[in-house]
Amino acid sequence: MAELTIKPEEIRAALDSFVNSYEPSASAREEVGRVTLAADGIAEVEGLPGAMANELLQFEDGTLGLALNLDVRHIGVVVLGEFTGIEEGQEVRRTGEVLSVPVGDGYLGRVVDPLGNPIDGLGDVETEGRRALELQAPGVMARKSVHEPLQTGIKAIDSMIPIGRGQRQLIIGDRQTGKTAIAIDTILNQKANWDSGDPSKQVRCVYVAIGQKGSTIASVRGALEDAGALEYTTIVAAPASDPAGFKYLAPYTGSAIGQHWMYQGKHVLIVFDDLSKQAEAYRAVSLLLRRPPGREAYPGDVFYLHSRLLERCAKLSDELGAGSMTGLPIIETKANDVSAYIPTNVISITDGQIFLQSDLFNANQRPAVDVGISVSRVGGDAQVKGMKKVSGTLKLELAQYRSLEAFAMFASDLDAASRAQLKRGAALTELLKQPQYSPFAVEDQVAMIWSGTNGYLDDVETADIHRFESELLDHLRRHTSVLDDIASSGLLTDETEEALRNGVESFRRTFAGSDGQIIGGGEPESDGEDVDVEQEQIVRQKRG
């Protein structure tokens, strides 16, 4: 009988050959889990030991779910869609994919849900690929400092709280104070840039509606369409009737759509309206998943919820195409309390805030921007030079007016300098009022703020200021090239300023107030001694 010899090399080769040629059957390859609990948009699934965090799972009826909790025996799944058809005992399968959305220029002018599906009845969207919702924000070396202006068309903001491309500027205030109006006006103001056809000027806009009424979203879409702004805007809608999971995901969907354009070297403006409702939706999801609650019952990672979203807004370096994504997150406060949990979180993440006061709104000061506590931390570097030149004195005039106004309420008589200061402050305050959906070009803003801070509105009645404004701008367009010079260069040179002074003075000689009297021309009327006293007070306040 021949002796049996065992060669390890042959055994090893046979095993390698078997392993390399092995193809598992579909049943062996596919993991199947079962629903053990389903309620309130949340499902608990047992099985699926290989499921990943944030992986998409598919239920029997085709509904998708997002794996958020990976416990030892169960997976906590947020149902993405209608959950009434999901019952205990149903099978659940892995998809092997993380949540992503389609992206591309086909989304311009469309209204989509948080999964990227069109809901406007205009057919399918032409896409250019897909982008994962959970993406790392650009690193420090991938960024560039904010240095290009993003004009909102709102005088109070562009002059005193400027925004740059790539900045995160919070809009915060009580309900019904005009937060959405500021964001929509900013989108409308990008139309001239879009119509120019210059890619370096064009700004694509994304409006993310979170927890809003369906009628409100429809009115926003109508306003954009009427103004011709819908062609460069995408609306991601997660109305109040949507499940909490959709409201939680909507901002990330809008961000993914915008990031696609940003990494192509284009400029994007994204509005999150509003992140308070996203935080509430995330709180609801977390409590249903039995995550431990923290302050105000929010989960411990609610700060990370917003920081990882807003850090995606950036100005990219030249090596990455120099694209940008500017973020305008909106936060709703209760009783003007900016020190609450979510407002302070988002204030600490963003590059500045525009605070809207309900008292100012009710006093008909609209937009109701509280200049005192509103700030832009990085926008000053991006501000148009001509605007920066005229806005410095505007801040000083308004600050002095506010302090003097409070004092004047209790004073029986005031000196001439104080009365002149109050008059100018009232004129400037009236000048900064602006109706909704009426953004101003930057050159128009520069001309009017220059006129106000140089005293050319001091003898104009408050009721006549807006008529004076529109007629003056019309006069400057027809008879001078001042506005074109400011628009093309962004500067207010000595020559341009002299031409502007001549244009304003010639117009004042023809402007009649509501009483029918010509207000006159030349230098603004004021007593020389009073001006000296006023200047001395300004110098003293600056030194103090």
From Swiss-Prot:
Family in the record: Belongs to the ATPase alpha/beta chains family.
Catalytic activity: ATP + H2O + 4 H(+)(in) = ADP + phosphate + 5 H(+)(out)
Gene Ontology molecular-function annotations: ADP binding; ATP binding; proton-transporting ATP synthase activity, rotational mechanism
Assembly notes: F-type ATPases have 2 components, CF(1) - the catalytic core - and CF(0) - the membrane proton channel. CF(1) has five subunits: alpha(3), beta(3), gamma(1), delta(1), epsilon(1). CF(0) has three main subunits: a(1), b(2) and c(9-12). The alpha and beta chains form an alternating ring which encloses part of the gamma chain. CF(1) is attached to CF(0) by a central stalk formed by the gamma and epsilon chains, while a peripheral stalk is formed by the delta and b chains.
Protein name as catalogued: ATP synthase subunit alpha
Topological relation to the membrane, as annotated: Peripheral membrane protein
Class of the enzyme per the UniProt entry, highest EC level: translocase
Domain of life: Bacteria
Residues with site note (Required for activity): 374
Enzyme Commission number(s) from the entry: 7.1.2.2
One Gene Ontology cellular component: proton-transporting ATP synthase complex
Subcellular location: Cell membrane
Function of the protein: Produces ATP from ADP in the presence of a proton gradient across the membrane. The alpha chain is a regulatory subunit.
Residue ranges, annotated region (Disordered): 513-544
Bias (Acidic residues): 524-535
Keywords of this entry: ATP synthesis, ATP-binding, Cell membrane, CF(1), Hydrogen ion transport, Ion transport, Membrane, Nucleotide-binding, Translocase, Transport
CDD domains: ATP-synt_F1_alpha_C (cd18113), ATP-synt_F1_alpha_N (cd18116), F1-ATPase_alpha_CD (cd01132)
Residues binding ATP, per UniProt: 173-180
Pfam families: ATP-synt_ab, ATP-synt_ab_C, ATP-synt_ab_N
